[in-house]
Swiss-Prot record:
Keyword terms, alphabetized: Aminoacyl-tRNA synthetase, ATP-binding, Cytoplasm, Ligase, Nucleotide-binding, Protein biosynthesis
Lineage: Bacteria, Pseudomonadati, Pseudomonadota, Betaproteobacteria, Burkholderiales
CDD domains: Anticodon_Ia_Arg, ArgRS_core
This protein's GO CC annotations: cytoplasm
UniProt name for this protein: Arginine--tRNA ligase
Length: 561
């Protein structure tokens, strides 16, 4: 049922309730019955109102139905209504109401499922990998989730900024530099004098080789960095290695079809004095104390749910990692992004309360729930029934590029979105490569391609199909498909509201299933011209909505397979 139809039906039910219970304030909610045979849409409004009104719920439900069906507008939407159980009202839509989705999709096309612009803006930060190695499968899940969430925000009317925060300061960058230095000097990872916390993948050898060759590299948002070849200068090695890996990560993201609007460097927070300014403000506001030679933040007193106070400045003098995060999010707020979402691995769970506490301590009018977080669990990669743990180039993990090379970008995106972010996920390489109904990407894309081929072979023109009489679409499998297509805008709205693109992935699978069921139950290219055109119009409508849904996930909609 289209959203506009739902709004109209709710208004009509409220009018019917007012006739039965003039003093009642009806909060009418509609839901789809779990069993299709029970109807197209249902409400429990009679059960809600019966007790305070001291009425029998089934009798009240019958009164509401009688008053409702006396309204001519209701009869245009509702074919019949049935009282079920303790007082549910189940409705069956008229054929015209069911078929209205076809014209809605035709008039809106690519915009079907999208909302008008709302004048709001949001910053979504995701991937945000350390520039210390290739992007791994966890980053791939973050990239898929983040880009889909951005697309959902855009579909919901928001202006979206995609941001990548580079953790280019701290011990991990020093470890990167000394690792490249060691490999440049011919020290192998298994040698006793190789750095204890050094990186061991083959990419370290590649960086060392290019550094010695005095090559130049450039990240997408940076200046060219030319290697000096001086292995005694850790500063030179560090600058080249970071630029090299940022460029490598850029290439991974390009292969994924993902472009960021902005890159923000952690080092810039130190260089600009924002980290020190943040610390000074928290001290001045009285939210810190000294103990054991360290500076502590009173996070337990700042109302964000942290269970103990946290060290800001360690006894040896360095800041803990959440301090620049607080500074960074203050900068986000000052840039006018009063709605921000961070997509991170579940191992960042402990930082949520700390960062929010730091922001509260700044007393800058920032809400306690800023920023919002989507925390995802990690990914296990399986092939041939065994877990794949190691990439030779990365040294200790499967890379994002490995996945793309093995199964393609579309499969990587869909598979990493199809489950809730807070659940662990097993990426089955064999399944992603299979051409079967069990592979959801193949199943959905095949539905789209099958429709394109069917229309191309039909001999009917686009104009003929667009003018077809949808009143002829009355088969049960056609009603089921029409109902599914009508749900799409509400699924998009729900996915955006919950920051949960898996809702769209589920819907796409269900829609493809409904299409294949209809295709197998009813011949499309029948001899009767009017029915043939009507069914081609339903197929074309399905093709459009499948394409819209796939686009929200960053997955292609092929015309042929």
């Amino acid at each position: 049922m289209l959203l506009e139809q739902q709004k109209q039906l709710i208004s009509l039910i409220q009018a019917a309730v007012a006739q039965c219970l003039p003093e009642a304030q009806a909060q009418v909610q509609l839901e789809r019955p779990k069993v299709a045979a029970h109807g197209d849409i249902a409400t429990n409004v009679a059960m809600q109102l019966a007790k305070p009104a001291r009425r029998n719920p089934r009798e009240l439900a019958q009164g509401i139905v009688d008053a409702l069906m006396a309204q001519p507008q209701a009869r245009e939407l509702i074919q019949d209504a049935e009282i079920a159980g303790p007082g549910f009202i189940n409705f069956r839509l008229t054929p015209a109401a069911r078929q209205a989705v076809v014209q809605a999709v035709a008039s809106q096309a690519d915009a079907y499922g999208r909302a008008p612009r709302n004048g709001e803006k949001v910053l979504v930060e995701f991937v945000s990998a350390n520039p210390t190695g290739p992007l791994h499968v966890g980053h791939a899940r973050q990239a898929a989730l983040g880009d889909a969430i951005c697309r959902l925000y855009d579909a919901s009317g928001w202006d979206v900024t995609r941001e990548f925060y580079y953790n280019d300061a701290g011990n991990q960058i020093d470890n990167l530099a000394i690792s490249v230095q060691a490999r440049g000097r011919g020290i192998a990872p298994d040698a006793p004098d190789y750095p204890t916390d050094g990186y061991k993948g083959d990419y370290i050898v590649e960086i060392a080789r290019d550094f010695a060759a005095r090559k130049s590299v450039q990240a997408s948002d940076g200046q060219p960095v030319t290697a000096t070849g001086d292995l005694d200068s850790l500063d030179d090695i560090r600058a080249f290695a970071v630029a090299y890996l940022r460029r490598e990560q850029d290439l991974d993201l390009q292969a994924f079809g993902l472009a960021f609007d902005n890159y923000f460097l952690e080092s810039s927070l130190y260089a600009s004095g924002r980290v020190q300014e943040t610390v000074d403000t928290l001290v001045a506001k009285g939210h810190t104390y000294e103990e054991g030679g360290a500076l502590w933040l009173r996070t337990t007193e700042l109302g964000t749910g942290d269970d103990k106070d946290r060290v800001m400045r360690k006894s040896e003098g360095g800041y803990t990692y959440f301090v620049p995060d607080v500074a960074y999010h203050k900068v986000k707020w000052e840039r006018g992004f009063h709605h921000a979402v961070n997509i991170q691995g579940s191992d960042h769970h402990g930082t949520v309360a700390r960062v929010r506490a730091g922001l509260q301590g700044l007393e800058a009018g920032i809400p306690k729930d800023f920023p919002a977080y989507v925390l995802h669990k990690m990914v296990k990669v399986m092939r041939g029934g065994e877990e794949v743990k190691i990439s030779k180039r990365a040294g200790s993990y499967v890379t994002m590029r490995d996945l793309i090379d093995w199964v393609g970008r579309d499969a990587v995106r869909y598979f990493l979105i199809q489950r809730r972010a807070d659940t662990e996920f097993v990426f089955d390489i064999d399944l992603a490569l299979s051409k079967s109904d069990e592979n959801p990407v193949y199943y959905i894309q095949y539905a789209h391609a099958r429709i394109c081929t069917m229309i191309g072979n039909s001999g009917a023109s686009a104009a003929e199909i667009a003018q077809a009489d949808t009143a002829l679409l009355t088969a049960p499998s056609e009603y089921a498909l029409l109902q599914r297509l009508a749900e799409f805008p509400q699924v998009v709205a729900l996915a955006a509201q919950e920051l949960a693109p898996h809702h769209v992935a589920f819907w796409l699978r269900d829609c493809a299933s409904d299409f294949h069921a209809w295709y197998n139950a009813e011949r499309v290219l029948v001899d009767e011209p009017a029915l043939k055109l009507a069914r081609l119009r339903l197929a074309a409508t399905t093709r459009q909505v499948l394409a819209n849904g796939l686009a929200l996930l960053g997955v292609s909609a092929p015309d042929r397979m």
